[in-house]
Amino acid sequence: MDWDWGNRCSRPGRRDLLCVLALLAGCLLPVCRTRVYTNHWAVKIAGGFAEADRIASKYGFINVGQIGALKDYYHFYHSRTIKRSVLSSRGTHSFISMEPKVEWIQQQVVKKRTKRDYDLSHAQSTYFNDPKWPSMWYMHCSDNTHPCQSDMNIEGAWKRGYTGKNIVVTILDDGIERTHPDLMQNYDALASCDVNGNDLDPMPRYDASNENKHGTRCAGEVAATANNSHCTVGIAFNAKIGGVRMLDGDVTDMVEAKSVSYNPQHVHIYSASWGPDDDGKTVDGPAPLTRQAFENGVRMGRRGLGSVFVWASGNGGRSKDHCSCDGYTNSIYTISISSTAESGKKPWYLEECSSTLATTYSSGESYDKKIITTDLRQRCTDNHTGTSASAPMAAGIIALALEANPFLTWRDVQHVIVRTSRAGHLNANDWKTNAAGFKVSHLYGFGLMDAEAMVMEAEKWTTVPQQHVCVESTDRQIKTIRPNSAVRSIYKASGCSDNPNHHVNYLEHVVVRITITHPRRGDLAIYLTSPSGTRSQLLANRLFDHSMEGFKNWEFMTIHCWGERAAGDWVLEVYDTPSQLRNFKTPGKLKEWSLVLYGTSVQPYSPTNEFPKVERFRYSRVEDPTDDYGAEDYAGPCDPECSEVGCDGPGPDHCSDCLHYYYKLKNNTRICVSSCPPGHYHADKKRCRKCAPNCESCFGSHGNQCLSCKYGYFLNEETSSCVTQCPDGSYEDIKKNVCGKCSENCKACIGFHNCTECKGGLSLQGSRCSVTCEDGQFFNGHDCQPCHRFCATCSGAGADGCINCTEGYVMEEGRCVQSCSVSYYLDHSSEGGYKSCKRCDNSCLTCNGPGFKNCSSCPSGYLLDLGTCQMGAICKDGEYIDDQGHCQTCEASCAKCWGPTQEDCISCPVTRVLDDGRCVMNCPSWKFEFKKQCHPCHYTCQGCQGSGPSNCTSCRADKHGQERFLYHGECLENCPVGHYPAKGHACLPCPDNCELCYNPHVCSRCMSGYVIIPPNHTCQKLECRQGEFQDSEYEECMPCEEGCLGCTEDDPGACTSCATGYYMFERHCYKACPEKTFGVKWECRACGTNCGSCDQHECYWCEEGFFLSGGSCVQDCGPGFHGDQELGECKPCHRACENCTGSGYNQCSSCQEGLQLWHGTCLWSTWPQVEGKDWNEAVPTEKPSLVRSLLQDRRKWKVQIKRDATSQNQPCHSSCKTCNGSLCASCPTGMYLWLQACVPSCPQGTWPSVTSGSCEKCSEDCVSCSGADLCQQCLSQPDNTLLLHEGRCYHSCPEGFYAKDGVCEHCSSPCKTCEGNATSCNSCEGDFVLDHGVCWKTCPEKHVAVEGVCKHCPERCQDCIHEKTCKECMPDFFLYNDMCHRSCPKSFYPDMRQCVPCHKNCLECNGPKEDDCKVCADTSKALHNGLCLDECPEGTYKEEENDECRDCPESCLICSSAWTCLACREGFTVVHDVCTAPKECAAVEYWDEGSHRCQPCHKKCSRCSGPSEDQCYTCPRETFLLNTTCVKECPEGYHTDKDSQQCVLCHSSCRTCEGPHSMQCLSCRPGWFQLGKECLLQCRDGYYGESTSGRCEKCDKSCKSCRGPRPTDCQSCDTFFFLLRSKGQCHRACPEHYYADQHAQTCERCHPTCDKCSGKEAWSCLSCVWSYHLLKGICIPECIVGEYREGKGENFNCKKCHESCMECKGPGSKNCTGCSAGLLLDMDDNRCLHCCNASHSRRSQDCCDCQSSTDECILPAREAEFYEHTKTALLVTSGAMLLLLLGAAAVVWRKSRSRPVAKGRYEKLAEPTVSYSSYRSSYLDEDQVIEYRDRDYDEDDEDDIVYMGQDGTVYRKFKYGLLDETEDDELEYDDESYSYQ
């Protein structure tokens, strides 16, 4: 029975239990894999073998011995522990980990390791006794008898004499058969052991299946003996071969470490053909011991040259495994070898990854030939396969290379392999050449190994430079990996260029450490792109990997960047492709990643290492798919950017294919370039595409594919999008333009550690979030713990951690005690009741109080006398009794003492104080003076004035390591609200009204009722404007409901007043009154009862069940009327009815007097019962007044009717010409029909129409009129005033008119608009500007014209260019951020009424240079002569209070303070920390050591250190000290300091000066420009360097920066202005055909078809040029391609464009809107021109500089004006020199001979051109919605425009690509057209 599992498990609506269980088992299988613990331990013990034995014995272990070559690592065995257990061991022996000498211990876990051969189940082993040499095909690829086209050239190496002699190779496997005839001759016992059996014999364990044949097979490939007529030949048949048996048992970390480190000084090469399971779901690698063994091996193996480890890459191809999940092949220390089949095709078992270094042969399909080698039981096999066969083959080739050069290091070997391996005929679809020129593949690494090339390279090899390791840690920011999407992270690496010991310039290995959490690891794919563009696949999707463990610091490695440069942008991409087995869409997270770059700082290859690669294989040419790109008509050289395919011309736009990348121009021409420019990314197939508008760099064109952002945007790295506001939990990092993550405990922040709001359970302490403990508790780093019972408050555990003591305890020397100790007394004098024990006077043994007069007992030898301790009568003061009873003199510093040393004082002279038995000048900083004695401060204080915790004067970290800060005499752990922790450990106040800050100038959070005001970040009172209310919770002004001028926080919708244009109703404001209300004087009033809509006069309609009657609502309409249910009105009954149910004559319910009711009809009682002729007409309803007048007229007519009742027909009324019953239908001449009656004159609101003969209504807004558009008086209402203008009524007068008495009158010139009277202007004509209602030619002083209105400059501003942008401040004020301030902020200094930034090292400064600092930005730096230094220079010391370097005393050479000399100047010696001369000499003398007497100074010196004139300290009057010499006048470069009588060096920028600072220059050095008294290499913004005068001259005030004084010399513009680059001008609003780029602050050209636009794309048009009309933002041509419109209206003709234009808007060559291929459009005069580097352009006067731009044409001629300007200085200087040399006559002669300078303009063409005015299309619907789509922002997207010709044919602009190019996102066609049938 066949089970259709696929259908069964995927069929919708069905859930089979067996299917579900099977899927669950598959998903949980990796999770349920059990660890097996052994009874073996690995232990690291310091102290040697004996110490290890002692510890092992103590805890019941047996010390088996050292683990391999790992020093201090030992193998312990415990016989009483279960041999194999799923639980780790417990018991007393586990206490070994607590031994001090035990540094590390690990119980060994069994690892699963798989041999990397493949056993074909159907193949029967065939054994041969004959020699196999002829059948070893992989040795004979060069003899043309085998399909393998590429040879490993092993015979070539043999012919050069290399066979592996003296090289030792060890096979790490299941043992080797050392007795095999092909192995026994080369067997090396020193390279062999049995780790599984713990002996030295590697012989395999034999069984019936011959399972342990693997190691013997691998060994035969390497070193099978040649010419012994037994079986086969090894690649290195004279090499020594050993084996380590380690796979035939439990494989643990210790087993592996022993194996890979076995006898490393003897073994050269270790070969391993095993690894973790190749099941497609395992992620495993070497554990700590094995990793250590690898590192030790490469560092110390082979006597420091490094062991060589060769590893098989893996056989998990069928399981879709990826060898990057194998930590052995993924290591930089191993050489990972893959396999290729004889045909060069990929074997089915092969895994691919970026760590594979090279390839050797193995088998492919089952029918392919396999590898011949030795086998168990002294036999041979021709069935060896898999990567297991490839690794030993590589080990053999490496052995040949090591024989050729035994001094190759382990890295040399890898370099040699990289340089000599080659692609050959190996078939892979991902071969690529990296930036260093190496061809590499994920399947085969650098290709097939070449033995001959390797030995040739090794012979002349020079050891590569030392390996450098650079760890580049990226920002740790978690990114969400969403299903079916990618996460990209970019990191700009420097290669550790700032650290010479770690600098990596040229790469070898690149390791990426990644931590990822994910619900299904197998769905992930990871890529890394190097700065050179080489893309490595670090991980591919793995179908069988269901693990939810993700990756934890897993190291992926790539060798694909070998030889490339390290510095630049590295891009990591993580893709999540959910599999069908994944039933949930939980996103993963990229938690962190880092780069480890391995390589060298210098080029690794010396000239002797240069070796040309030679392809040694039979080459059969494969047809190049690009051969179609011939260049039949062109035979010249191609542009360097063209590929080898060729070109059809010399320029980069003539390439048939590009070498690197290409642009597409507007006209679809492709230009080849070397790299994509900023704002673009490298798309597939060498194409440069544009990033999304907000991206600075990107990896795709969508808005969520940004890598960095433009200014003003921040990169949200989770979404890879650029946002203007970062999401919650992150902050705006302005320096990096990214959204940085707040620290873990922050809810909101302004920096990683600068929290402004904390998560639940935490409180803000300063700028960090931490736990706040209650009184009586302290925080130990994890939680709150109770203080010691003696403490009321504390900062740590124990009685010595108290801050205050509990009741009944007092503080003594930092501890809380119940009573004072001996020699202490209880002090009650402290403020606030604080009690403490203070030390007694030193003369007392015990005391009752302070001082020497409160003693209660005395020391031995002293007598108590009235509270004082007196010396006995034997000795005097200043003496003590020695042991012999004699009086001896105290040490000189003591007044009284009890011993001879300076520590035995008991009282001191008046100039000193007593401190612990010493008499000192001052108490140390941690003590305070009281009663001439030093007492310790409270332990929280650094300095103090008393013993309490509130008597501190300075703070530091306390004894518990807690940082403390001074606040009101207390040292606190955290500063209170409104203060910040400053340097010096003090809490300093924040700016006024600030609650949280980090310096005294910038506030982060204001107090309640205040808000932060940028840009200074100060707090101002929260004063809400009209229409806002103060939100107390968020402390900001929130808007009231729409229309409110005032409201309250309790109910923002309850308005106190309304804005203009809004109506008030029940405390709410409405744009229009709500239902059932009407507006009167901007108030809504309720309609009458039951009225649904009304005005102040009447109701318009009523609620259901009521009827409108006479302007009010009634339920019963009354007699003569009936309720019309449909209209909701009371309608009159027929005139015959008294009551009725409808208006018809037959709907009466009762009749008028004299009439009778008959079937609903009222009839005369005398009439026959037939319908009357006139009774079938209802009376029309009109306004009540009109109805009333008509009824009166009808009453008279009724009487007439009664009189003529006998007549059958009645005549019309006399006023009617014709009638319809009693109503007129038309009127005679002179009468007009109105309400079915004829009137002689029309009523108000109507006018007599001669044409219709009736009274026509005036327009609704007109009270009286004389014609349809001839209003005479407009309707006037209080809330709706209308004005009469030219016979029509308007709400406001048109431009140029003002309202007077309800009529629009003309404004007087030059008013454009006015109000109130003709001269009260609101705006002005032409160039006039408005100021206070008057139009002037220019604005008054301190004003600026903004949109034609004079605006006052900002406060304190002298001159401005915008109402918010000041250019020059009034005296005593300084310009900062476009505003004027009384003083400059921190990090700025005032200069020429401007705030100029300090150097980055300075917090405060008086100039821009690094030596102009007044306060350092880095608090750890020391300030010396304006410089911020790490340490103070010799002769100075650091003053801790202000971090300044102060000069040592004059005699001091080195000092630590002003009073502590450490070394003295010549002639002085240190005595008691002071430099003193042996003898005091006179001021004009010095001490001569030779004669031991004072000698006179030189006559030029005032004070000196020796006899010569260059040994002066000071100088006589009117001379000045220059270094150590006295001079009469200071030389140039120095200024004279008359106060100190010294020559002080000028600043390095000054030539002459008046002081040492950069702001005190009088003249500048050559090449510098003077600005005020400052010399600059480059003038600051607002100035330019004038080379003739050497000064910085002012730019025109319209420029922010410039190259000259004119308004056309601007290079950048101030805020609110935009630079028009082509003119060099700054514009407030961009001119016609340009739009304002708000980010770049430039005016950019619209698309050629746009007249006005919002962007440069073709779809951003707002209006169009002639011959185009607007449709959804695109200007569509009205003629077919190549033609333009001629004529207006619907009947127009289409004429052909000029031959140079592809599209145009008019005739001639200067009306082009699109160009043909190879031409670029000059936007300024709409011409199509060639590139200047094109051959045919050399004949043309004008051409485009395509090097500058490929998007539009830039004429080289436009540079002329700039160059002309820069040459001005040279011309002026030359003229001055000629004046001096030749005189006036020569100048006249020169002028007469001079020729006019050519101006940088264009020559007017003779061909006439017609200009066509632009117009706005009327086709744009008012309700048109332009939908935004997230799309590719590419420069050629707008080219795909479809338009229709006059004949109905639809045309399209087409895009052309290379013929071999296919793109999923874009179709490319030939010309096509469609016709509508």
Curated annotation (Swiss-Prot):
Point out the annotated site residues (description: Cleavage): R116, D117
Residue ranges annotated as transmembrane are: 1769-1789
Alphabetized, the UniProt keywords read: Cleavage on pair of basic residues, Glycoprotein, Hydrolase, Membrane, Pregnancy, Protease, Repeat, Secreted, Serine protease, Signal, Transmembrane, Transmembrane helix, Zymogen
Spans annotated as AC 1: 1825-1844
Q: Where are the FU repeats?
A: 632-682, 685-732, 736-779, 781-826, 834-881, 884-929, 931-981, 984-1030, 1034-1079, 1081-1123, 1127-1168, 1206-1248, 1252-1299, 1301-1345, 1347-1390, 1392-1438, 1442-1487, 1491-1536, 1540-1585, 1589-1636, 1640-1685, 1691-1738
Which Enzyme Commission number(s) are listed? Answer: 3.4.21.-
Which positions does the motif Cell attachment site occupy?
A: 521-523
Give me the residues of the propeptide, which is removed upon maturation. 35-116
Write out the topological domains of type Extracellular. Answer: 117-1768
Which residue ranges does the record assign to the P/Homo B domain?
Answer: 463-603
GO CC annotations? endoplasmic reticulum lumen; extracellular space; Golgi apparatus; membrane; secretory granule
Which residues are reported to be glycosylated? N227, N383, N667, N754, N804, N854, N951, N1016, N1220, N1317, N1523, N1711, N1733
Q: Which InterPro entries match?
A: EGF-like_dom, Furin_repeat, Galactose-bd-like_sf, GF_recep_IV, Growth_fac_rcpt_cys_sf, Kexin/furin, P_dom, Peptidase_S8/S53_dom
> Which BP terms does GO give this entry?
anterior/posterior pattern specification; cardiac septum development; coronary vasculature development; cytokine precursor processing; determination of left/right symmetry; embryo implantation; embryonic digestive tract development; embryonic skeletal system development
Where does the signal sequence lie? 1-34
Domain note: The propeptide domain acts as an intramolecular chaperone assisting the folding of the zymogen within the endoplasmic reticulum.
What is the similarity comment for this entry? Answer: Belongs to the peptidase S8 family.
Protein name, per record: Proprotein convertase subtilisin/kexin type 5
Species for this entry:
Mus musculus
